[in-house]
Amino acid sequence: MSSEQQNEADSKPAVIPQCFKIENQYETFSRLSETSTPGVVPSVSTLWRLLFELQKMIECEPSCVEYFRQRKEELESHVDSEIETSKDESSVNKVEEKVEEFKEDNVEQEIKQKRSLSESPQESMLEKVSKKPKVSEAHNEEISPENVETIENELDLPVKGKDEQTTGLVYKNANDLLTGSLLSFIVDDSFSYEQKKKLLCVDSFPTSDVRSLVAGTPATDDFSHNKPNNQISISTFYSSLDPYFRAFNDDDIAFLKKGFDVSSSYNIPPLGERYYDLTPEDEMTNLCANSIYQNLQTSAQGSLEAFNEADTVSEEVRCGPLTERLMASLIPCYTQNDEEQKPSIAVGEFAETDSGSEKSKIGTSIDGIESGNNEYTEQPDIQESSLSICEDRLRYTLKQLGILYDGDVDWSKRQDDEISATLRSLNARLKVVSDENEKMRNALLQMLPEEMAFQEFQNVMDDLDKQIEQAYVKRNRSLKVKKKRIVTDKIGSSATSGSFPVIKSLMDKRSMWLEKLQPLFQDKLTQHLGSPTSIFNDLSDHTTSNYSTSV
């Protein structure tokens, strides 16, 4: 090697492998090994992270040895080139001494230093976490199930009884920890894909979170030893599912053909007597018998001339039901919101202007009504001031205006109260639901005969399959018995030939059954279990529109 090549080799920087940056890993390891509270056992997640960092530091040792081996070869080649070019024997001896010194001192010293760095974090972890005497050469020996409990007590690993109150975890014992069954609890997004595969000892790892695909929450209790007292038997479970998976029969067709008359549900019963909250039954009976509401008078009585203030609390002088309702509709109804919204002008001015405007409106409307009525027919004689005549005149006027239809109203059977209005609204909704049920019943009635035919086809197929299976079992059983005995070939052939025609006839019957009837149910045989869409989709859309219209 020339002097220029030698200078170039000396000036070339040495490539330090990535594993030599062990100080960063040591800092990470120290940060993980520190516990918040002294004397508290860290969680299993922290322990596994510590072991993972230790494994990465220990793996640095082979790469360090490889690095020094390469440097040694470079130095030896450099020394050999110096020996060839140098003519001075003393310089050769100096170079050889330099190589020997580097071999003995520098290389071994560096390797020992790196080994001590990789071993010191492990000792510090055991001192901080376990705080118990170190088990000699426990990491080199195989851990058997017999000494798992001993190691658990010596290392003070977290178990269910200790971590259940502190960390909320449900780890069982040290065996689960050592076998790696708890690794799935510590893998998070901070690990790379290769680290996850290496940590879990698998060839592949799911790239997305698949916990949403798990059927429910996994059970964390131990059911291997103690059986729950309230566990439901399997027979009870099957019997509860039987009504949903049973076969159809003729009773189902008869049930669908039988209609349900719900017309009586739309009739609103007449109003009954008033309720009196009286405890003695005799007093209630007497009071109801003498009550004025038992035979309620709906006709107008009395006249305006004989009307005084004392008649307001009795039924001797009263207006007709139409007049009472019309007057009740003209009375203003004040609510709490109306009281809060006070007018900005004075109350007296507001009352005067309001009353004046109302009087003017009422006067003009009455004049218009009277003038309009004179155009059609003559009004009845109203010289008498009887309330019944006022009732008839009011009814006549409302009919002329088109507000009141022709026909007499039976006021004793009125149904315009709040309860009757609610009943009519519910009856309208009930009618919509009844129409929907009727359409669904007709749809099921049309599909049920085809389903029962396919059900019969499957039953016959299952029966033929069972007969063929029983024939084969019987044939094989007879052959096993014949093999145990010493028989001639003639006897064996006769035994097999006797069962063959039975099996052949069953197979022919099955093939003929499939050939004749399978094309009729090809769609049902090829489709998956269950229908992809509901058979009531069209009905539900139509019913929803009708329901919204009625409401």
From Swiss-Prot:
<protein>
    <recommendedName>
        <fullName>SAGA complex subunit Ngg1</fullName>
    </recommendedName>
</protein>
<comment type="function">
    <text>Component of the transcription coactivator SAGA complex. SAGA acts as a general cofactor required for essentially all RNA polymerase II transcription. At the promoters, SAGA is required for transcription pre-initiation complex (PIC) recruitment. It influences RNA polymerase II transcriptional activity through different activities such as TBP interaction (via core/TAF module) and promoter selectivity, interaction with transcription activators (via Tra1/SPT module), and chromatin modification through histone acetylation (via HAT module) and deubiquitination (via DUB module).</text>
</comment>
<dbReference type="GO" id="GO:0003713">
    <property type="term" value="F:transcription coactivator activity"/>
</dbReference>
<keyword id="KW-0597">Phosphoprotein</keyword>
<keyword id="KW-0805">Transcription regulation</keyword>
<feature type="modified residue" description="Phosphoserine">
    <location>
        <position position="144"/>
    </location>
</feature>
<feature type="compositionally biased region" description="Basic and acidic residues">
    <location>
        <begin position="125"/>
        <end position="142"/>
    </location>
</feature>
<dbReference type="GO" id="GO:0005634">
    <property type="term" value="C:nucleus"/>
</dbReference>
<keyword id="KW-0804">Transcription</keyword>
<dbReference type="InterPro" id="IPR019340">
    <property type="entry name" value="Histone_AcTrfase_su3"/>
</dbReference>
<keyword id="KW-0156">Chromatin regulator</keyword>
<keyword id="KW-0539">Nucleus</keyword>
<comment type="similarity">
    <text>Belongs to the NGG1 family.</text>
</comment>
<comment type="subunit">
    <text>Component of the 1.8 MDa SAGA (Spt-Ada-Gcn5 acetyltransferase) complex, which is composed of 19 subunits tra1, spt7, taf5, ngg1/ada3, sgf73, spt20, spt8, taf12, taf6, hfi1/ada1, ubp8, gcn5, ada2, spt3, sgf29, taf10, taf9, sgf11 and sus1.</text>
</comment>
<feature type="modified residue" description="Phosphoserine">
    <location>
        <position position="120"/>
    </location>
</feature>
<feature type="compositionally biased region" description="Polar residues">
    <location>
        <begin position="371"/>
        <end position="383"/>
    </location>
</feature>
<feature type="compositionally biased region" description="Basic and acidic residues">
    <location>
        <begin position="106"/>
        <end position="117"/>
    </location>
</feature>
<feature type="region of interest" description="Disordered">
    <location>
        <begin position="351"/>
        <end position="383"/>
    </location>
</feature>
<dbReference type="GO" id="GO:0006357">
    <property type="term" value="P:regulation of transcription by RNA polymerase II"/>
</dbReference>
<dbReference type="GO" id="GO:0000124">
    <property type="term" value="C:SAGA complex"/>
</dbReference>
<feature type="region of interest" description="Disordered">
    <location>
        <begin position="106"/>
        <end position="144"/>
    </location>
</feature>
<dbReference type="Pfam" id="PF10198">
    <property type="entry name" value="Ada3"/>
</dbReference>
<feature type="coiled-coil region">
    <location>
        <begin position="417"/>
        <end position="476"/>
    </location>
</feature>
<dbReference type="GO" id="GO:0045815">
    <property type="term" value="P:transcription initiation-coupled chromatin remodeling"/>
</dbReference>
<keyword id="KW-0175">Coiled coil</keyword>
